[in-house]
Amino acid sequence: GEDATVNLLEQKVAQLFNHEAALFCASGTMANQIAVKAHTQPMDEIILDKTAHIYYYETAGYAFHSGVSVKLVDGKNGIISAGQVLENIQPNFDWLPKTSLVCLENTSNKGGGSCYDVQTIQEIKNVCTDNQLKLHIDGARLFNAIVSKAYTTHRIGELADSLSVCFSKGLGAPVGSVLIGNATFIRKAR
C-alpha cells in the first residue's frame, strides 16, 4: 500500500497475531474470498461447517472467484472437529476435487456465538498439517472468542495459515477487516 497509516495498521495487526504480514480489506467477505483464492487452485475443494459465513452469506463467492467447491460438515453450533475434517478429506482420485483448505468461523454467527477451544483448533491444525491442507480462520468476531476462551492473539495466530479479523464487529469501527498470514501469502493476496 501507499498509505503510511494503513501500512502501520497492517504491520501492527500482523505482529499482534504473530504473523509476518497483513492486508487491509474493505470487508470480512472480501478478506475471506481473497484467502480462499490465495490458498486454492480452481477445482479444489474446501471443508467448512454448513453454517459458515463463507458458505451461507458470501453468495458462492468461492465458486465464482476461485473455482472451488465446498464440502459441508455438520458441526455442533457451527463448530467442527478434527475427526470431521479427517473424514471429509477427498481421497486422491483423478476425478474428485483435491481438498486443499479448511475454513473455521470463530465465533460462529449462525452457531449463536459458539467459540472454538484452542485444543480443538490445534487438533484441526494437526490434521491439516498431516494432510497438506491450509487452515484459514474467519475471525469476524475473533476478539470475542479470544476473551471468551482466554487464549492469546499469538496462540491463535500460530495455529492458522491465515486469519481474517473484522474491525466493525468486536471493535465497532465503521468499516474494514484485515487478512493476516505469512509474507508470501500476503504478496499473493495483494
Predicted regions and their residues:
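Conserved PLP-enzyme active-site core in the AAT-like
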Residues: G1-R190
